[in-house]
Regions:
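All-alpha prenyltransferase/terpene-synthase fold signal
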Residues: 1-190
Length: 190
């Protein structure tokens, strides 16, 4: 896998090193939060965010094994997996500046909306863009059986097409057929 034009940690080294690096980054984050004179609300927001992102990632992995998921399930998953990370970051910034509770909530909700928009756009770009532009591998979601927003919309338009598509073994061909279907059915404008 490629992210921002570079190999991911698990690709460059291995999965164990990637997990260890993630654990180390978490420990550093917690040290920064607990060593500073931050209000408990900031640490609470961080911990809640961390758990929520883990739950979202678990749902994403679970959905790989499911044949179909609903739009509601998808939106719940991306809210937890992607949106919550952005919302938590904004919320912590708002708490650091000691904004009132109402404004903190507005900022958090703004982060949720930005996160959903980002993830849906990223899902479409994975199919409709190219590796050079995106600076990341674009077939990983297809290979892993991820339930992305374009896949969900394609399923809603024609479930038989998606079943036939998954029988194709060539990932490049799958992406070509998906692009064609998305454009023909005007799915990218929904």
């Amino acid at each position: 896998s490629i992210r921002h034009g570079k190999k991911t940690v698990h690709e460059k080294w291995n999965v164990s090193t990637a997990i260890l690096a993630g654990d180390a980054m978490l420990a550093i984050s917690l040290n920064l939060l607990t060593n500073a004179k931050y209000d408990y609300k900031i640490i609470e927001a961080f911990n809640k965010g961390l758990l929520t992102v883990c739950e979202g990632q678990a749902l994403d992995k679970e959905f790989e094994e499911k044949k179909n998921i609903s739009e509601k399930q998808y939106l719940n998953m991306i809210e937890k997996k992607t949106s919550y990370l952005i919302a938590m970051s904004i919320e912590i910034g708002a708490l650091t500046y000691e904004l009132n509770k109402k404004d903190v909530k507005k900022m958090f909700n703004f982060g949720i909306s930005i996160g959903k928009a980002f993830q849906i756009q990223d899902d479409f770009l994975e199919i409709m863009s190219n590796t050079k532009k995106m600076k990341k591998s674009l077939n990983s979601d297809i290979i892993l059986g991820k339930k992305t927003y374009p896949i969900l919309l394609c399923n809603q338009k024609n479930n038989d097409f998606m079943i036939e598509l998954m029988e194709i073994k060539d990932v490049k061909k799958i992406i070509q057929e998906l692009r064609k279907f998305i454009i023909e059915k005007n799915i990218d404008n929904e």
